[in-house]
Curated annotation (Swiss-Prot):
InterPro entries: Ribosomal_uL6-like, Ribosomal_uL6-like_a/b-dom_sf, Ribosomal_uL6_a/b-dom, Ribosomal_uL6_bac-type, Ribosomal_uL6_CS. Part of the 50S ribosomal subunit. One of its GO terms (cellular component) is cytosolic large ribosomal subunit. This is Large ribosomal subunit protein uL6. GO terms for biological process: cytoplasmic translation. Belongs to the universal ribosomal protein uL6 family. It comes from Neisseria meningitidis serogroup A / serotype 4A (strain DSM 15465 / Z2491). Coiled coil: none annotated. Gene3D superfamilies: Ribosomal protein L6, alpha-beta domain.
């Protein structure tokens, strides 16, 4: 059995778990997420805890039980608490402005970048150089943050660009004459 799958997922109060024919549906205050059921993994719900057991003893079934447990755990956390990614803009003239579901970025290009948020992700800009992304799906929030960062990744000489809060950019030394 997978070491990850050995630990059950505790479902907090206010989170509903429904088993469908093809998917596990998790509902909470932050929305609803569904997880497609895999034929190699059996999921049981007892006393507010979800347990994951591999249907057979193959390596793939063990791996899938651990993967399923990790993904469902993230879904339970997402619908109850939510996920947040923070980005900061470092550079002269680099600005961000949120207008509803649209994020306008000025990153030193000749044109402004207009990024539309996907369903389930909200954006806020507490200051012109800070972006806060929130949502219930960890994968989607992380993907959006990575796409925004990719518009102008931090460069290694001055550190200018879009970076995650707390990210350490390894700086290079300038060429010497």
């Amino acid at each position: 059995m997978s070491r990850v799958a050995k630990n059950p997922v505790t479902v907090p109060a206010g989170v509903e778990v429904k088993f469908g024919t093809e998917a596990l549906v998790i509902k909470g205050k932050n929305g609803e997420l569904s997880f497609p059921l895999h034929s190699d993994v059996a999921i049981e719900f007892n006393d507010g805890k979800l347990t994951f057991v591999a249907n057979n003893s193959s390596k793939q079934a063990n791996a899938m039980s651990g993967t399923a447990r990790a993904l469902v755990s993230n879904m339970v956390k997402g619908v109850s608490e939510g996920f947040e990614k923070r980005l900061q803009l470092i550079g002269v003239g680099y600005r961000a402005q949120a207008q509803g579901k649209i994020l306008n970025l000025s990153l030193g290009f000749s044109h402004p970048i207009v990024y539309e948020m996907p369903e389930g992700v909200s954006v806020q800009t507490p200051s012109q150089t800070e972006i806060v992304l929130t949502g219930s799906d960890k994968q989607v929030v992380g993907q959006v943050a990575a796409e925004i960062r990719a518009f102008r990744a931090p460069e290694p000489y001055k550190g200018k660009g879009v970076r995650y809060v707390g990210e350490v950019v390894v700086m290079k030394e300038a060429k010497k004459k």
